Curated annotation (Swiss-Prot):
Stated name of the protein: DNA-directed RNA polymerase subunit alpha
Residue segments, region Alpha N-terminal domain (alpha-NTD): 1-235
Keywords recorded for this protein, A-Z: DNA-directed RNA polymerase, Nucleotidyltransferase, Transcription, Transferase
Species of the source: Magnetococcus marinus (strain ATCC BAA-1437 / JCM 17883 / MC-1)
GO terms for MF: DNA binding; DNA-directed RNA polymerase activity; protein dimerization activity
Domain notes: The N-terminal domain is essential for RNAP assembly and basal transcription, whereas the C-terminal domain is involved in interaction with transcriptional regulators and with upstream promoter elements.
InterPro entries: DNA-dir_RNA_pol_insert, DNA-dir_RNA_pol_RpoA/D/Rpb3, DNA-dir_RpoA, RBP11-like, RNAP_asu_C, RNApol_insert_sf
Entry GO CC: cytoplasm; DNA-directed RNA polymerase complex
Lineage: Bacteria, Pseudomonadati, Pseudomonadota, Alphaproteobacteria, Magnetococcales
Catalysed reaction, written as an equation: RNA(n) + a ribonucleoside 5'-triphosphate = RNA(n+1) + diphosphate
Amino acid sequence: MYRNWTELIKPHTIELGGDETEIQRKATLVAEPLERGFGTTLGNALRRVLLSSLQGAAVSTVRIEGVLHEFSSVPGVIEDVTDIILNIKGLALRMESTGIKNIYLRVDKEGPVTAGMIECETGIEILNPDHHIATLNKSGTLDITMTVTTGKGYVRAQLNREDESYAIGDIPIDASYNPVKKVAYRVENARVGQQTDYDKLIMDIETNGVVTPEDALALAAKILQDQLNPFINFDDVPTAHDHEMEDRPQWNPNLFRKVDELELSVRSANCLKNDDIVYIGDLVQKSESEMLKTPNFGRKSLNEIKEVLDEMGLSLGMTLDTWPPENIDDLSKQFEEENF
């Protein structure tokens, strides 16, 4: 039964890429190799969770001095209340605890009003202090009390209005708690050995800075894992086969391939054959200087072999303890069946 999941190929690492100056908000994450079809399966599931289920903080209610409803204007303020509320929705807030807290904006100075002018209670941080809220003229004043709550997804103003703490003068607003702003994924081909029909999952994630794209993806994966656990009706008990696999040295399976399987030029292939190099494991233990001493083996052949090895995650000059294994022929066949 264990073969249903243990023999599926899994990603080696999750690579993180993107502009270094924006990587806290925008990043591209690449997972490869994946079994054919798993790129779309995982990509779609992760995208849906990223856009719907992550917890965050947002303003759910505002109270503006002298204003009773959102279809009003504030004397001395260029923007009307609707525009001010739209700008407030764009605040990127980090709150250490759950519950309800308040933040305050009190300004009586002419000019632009930004998020950095907001006074926060302990445990609340505004991550976009340059975000525009409103613009005051000479006679303008602005006094706003904002209620910050925690939640997930998108909650409409009507639901916030039904809250027991709602009072006359409070203006409930739509609250977007999710720190993830955009997610897109695509699937490309990945190569494992000579096979090129595996999947590479590429995800472009943009957040508001409250969490990094890498952490957001990790949280989404954990949510999926936690939701799927109840469907598993057996214990993952180690078997004799599992212990055998643990005791086996963790070789790169390409080491057990024969060098004549590589798509090398005739000159390079003949040089390796004449030097009695049978397996790739034999080849990688050779240094560059040793290879160049091989008759008829030049710099061009060396570069060709280095390029082929690099595609496998290998290189010349490696040290392989206990190589070659006593049963190398059997292991070669076994690794070929399991990985190729």
